[in-house]
């Protein structure tokens, strides 16, 4: 296919038009008085959102060169979302400011390579400044503040804070759609996996159709059990103790299952059989997790252990186990806390090493089940459109809160970026490198300018006053007051602000040093040009 090529100024200008088109659509959502953007959906109702990355992903421009510019800025939003989970609009605003100011200077004769060096130097100093003013996040109240700011909703903030308090910072918090109008929190304590009882005859509560075992012994094996003789010795020891038994195996069937059911119905002893969770290597890893959590041993031939010679001391214990048709929950396993901590650290190391997103997600789930539990935030709303928008906001708030716990918080509302202004301004450089530093200085003001603009105020006046205020004091656009941002709970996670600045600078530097842009040439008239001639097929009616 033939290519269309544009060079230097013409190429950069075309890309800038695309950058502006996307950034102008995204930046109207910034701040407490930001507006919404409506996105057309081919099927169903339109999506109304103020989430920067969602808007950026939807934008596709007709002109190929402009579209490349738009896609580069969409990449800034997307990358920031991947790393920090929020701050996508801030990143887009910063990228647009750097690209626009940079192109002005390059057009006026500045050397793009020198400008790029200046941008990189200034961003490095700005990041050091951010870490200096960053404060660690402590306590439920601080977590609630971060979440409330991101979701623009105090109720959501307190829900997320409660969820993180209940399941710990490593816990899994999932967001689901609720059937009702209210948003609520549901927490599953202990370890839960998606396998239910092998037979409905094993239930202890026929109303709820669940089996509840108090202080049970837990036999964990990766073998298939078909013959009751294999587990009879250990079964007799459990019966003597007068305790119920949870049997987790690859499968329990045939005579073994029938014997367990018959004895349960007769009231001889209470045993519930459950299939092992997961598949393949992941199954073995999850069984090992359960054995660490309950203080038992995994009975596997890999370790030379045999079911027939299993002693009661090799079984795990828990204060309670609840088994339903689809799930098994182990509450308060009796495992050694030092061993559980070691296992948690081992899984954390695997999370850091893996490159697969799927593996990472599964490892995070295992980590959560060992470290705390699983919380589900059920989002409710009056209409489907509102539900989708609310769910997106809560996802952003959750990501934002996690980022805050990780790297601390800085003053929100664009204040932190202006707080590092003086540190960046102190850089001594010459020529085009200094031009690059000046571009970053101008860009640091842009988020607060946009927040003020969206609130119907003049950004320049607020920026000038902010530069002269002490660190931490900023402008609250929601109330039009000057306040101590951290005291008032108007905060941003350091990780979000850092990622936004880094990613914006990276793409801006790349775009400024672009000298040629290549795109597919649109085909003249398109390939469908011959189609109208098919009208002659109408004569085929005579063939009947």
UniProtKB/Swiss-Prot annotation:
ATP binds at residues 29-32, 86-90, 413, 476-478, 492. HAMAP family: CH60 (MF_00600). Keywords: ATP-binding, Chaperone, Cytoplasm, Isomerase, Nucleotide-binding. Together with its co-chaperonin GroES, plays an essential role in assisting protein folding. The GroEL-GroES system forms a nano-cage that allows encapsulation of the non-native substrate proteins and provides a physical environment optimized to promote and accelerate protein folding. The keyword Transferase does not apply. The keyword Cell cycle does not apply. InterPro entries: Chaperonin_Cpn60_CS (IPR018370), Cpn60/GroEL (IPR001844), Cpn60/GroEL/TCP-1 (IPR002423), GroEL-like_apical_dom_sf (IPR027409), GROEL-like_equatorial_sf (IPR027413), TCP-1-like_intermed_sf (IPR027410). It catalyses: ATP + H2O + a folded polypeptide = ADP + phosphate + an unfolded polypeptide. Forms a cylinder of 14 subunits composed of two heptameric rings stacked back-to-back. Interacts with the co-chaperonin GroES. It is an enzyme of class 5 (isomerase). GO terms for cellular component: cytoplasm. Belongs to the chaperonin (HSP60) family. It is found in: Cytoplasm. It comes from Bacillus pumilus (strain SAFR-032). This is Chaperonin GroEL. One of its GO terms (molecular function) is ATP binding. One of its GO terms (biological process) is protein refolding. The gene is groEL.
